[in-house]
Amino acid sequence: MEALQRQQAARLAQGVGPLAPPRLPLPQPPLLGARTLQAPEGAIGVVGAEEEEGAEDEEGETPLAEEETAEQSHPGARCPNSPSSQSPGIQPHEWTYEEQFKQLYELDADPKRKEFLDDLFSFMQKRGTPVNRVPIMAKQVLDLYALFRLVTAKGGLVEVINRKVWREVTRGLSLPTTITSAAFTLRTQYMKYLYPYECETRALSSPGELQAAIDSNRREGRRQAYTAVPLFNLAGPTPRGAPGPASSHGPAPTATPNCPGPTQGSASGLPAHACAQLSPSPVKKEESGIPPPRLALPMGLASEATREKLAPEEPPEKRAVLMGPVDSPRLGAPPSFLPRGKAPLREERLDGPLNLAGSGISSINVALEINGVVYTGILFARRQPVPASLGPTNPPPLPSTGPPSSTLP
């Protein structure tokens, strides 16, 4: 019985082993001794044990293979000291600043340069705004170390902006002085790379003071641009009692006797409507004994503005009286005939030698350009009072200036 149980156990062990070599069935002799059966049983049992140990070895090797596969798919995950995890391409923060910005470190042999640049780049990295590239200006590397020293030596960025000493900073950096936007470029580069470090280490100014300095500088630039363009003084508001164009636009200076003779002669020969075709040009101040009041309109726009002003308000008869051919005032006429804006022209009594029309507005603003000089003034119509319903009439001939006639009735 014991021999049969051993034989069955050997057969079971022979069938379970996965790597057991194929064996031919042994012939069973009719008469087997106990010693004969023990030998194959022991051999079979040894083989089965070896097969079981081989299976266990294979199962133990499986995690190692999986670890090797994981290491191949994820290099550097096994341990932090592996060579693959220390490669500079995977962890760029291990590069030194000197290797990244070698050009800045090699601009000169100042021993404080490396210390300053390391401190600057480390501060910007901790601040969350790392310096990712070397600033370039005028096709060369911008020396941040020299720029910081020059600006802080003059009191900081705000002081440099207020005093406008960027040209000195440009010279100190050995940059070409022909750069038109050198001040703006240096200011923006300093604000981006160096101003936070200045506030942290020197505390020469605050961001609020910097913004105020920039706004003030911008306003001054606009003011200079405005003053560079010649401006013309337009007439201000006048009393509402004077409806005429002369009073609505304000009084204007007339030709004075101090003007040259040829200019006056040519001005008196031009028609009044020719002033609308004159091109604008700067008004030149001329010497006169009377201080000139404000100009009524700039250059040749006087008559056009008069036409537009009278179009919706005055009847056709008054427009014809206003824009018709008129005679220029005499050169020796005193300046007291100018309207003062106190009462309408039709109700004024003028003491001058001119006979003004009493039917309405009888003057226009004129601007003539002769030989590059613009003359402005008021022309008055010399007409007899006529009813407005009869329409305009031809002006009467000028009164004779000779001796009075001796023919009497």
From Swiss-Prot:
Arranged from A to Z, the UniProt key words for this protein are:
DNA-binding, Nucleus, Transcription, Transcription regulation
User: GO CC terms for this protein?
Assistant: cytoplasm; membrane raft; nucleus
Which regions are flagged for Pro residues bias? 19-30, 393-402
* Basic and acidic residues compositional bias, start-end: 306-320
- Main subcellular location of this protein, as a coarse class: nucleus
Keyword Transcription (UniProt): yes
Q: State its role.
A: Transcription factor involved in monocyte-to-macrophage differentiation. Forms a complex with NPM1 to translocate to the nucleus, acting as a transcription factor that promotes the expression of the genes involved in macrophage differentiation, such as STAT3, STAT1 and JUNB.
Q: What is this protein called?
A: AT-rich interactive domain-containing protein 3C
| Organism name | Mus musculus (Mouse)
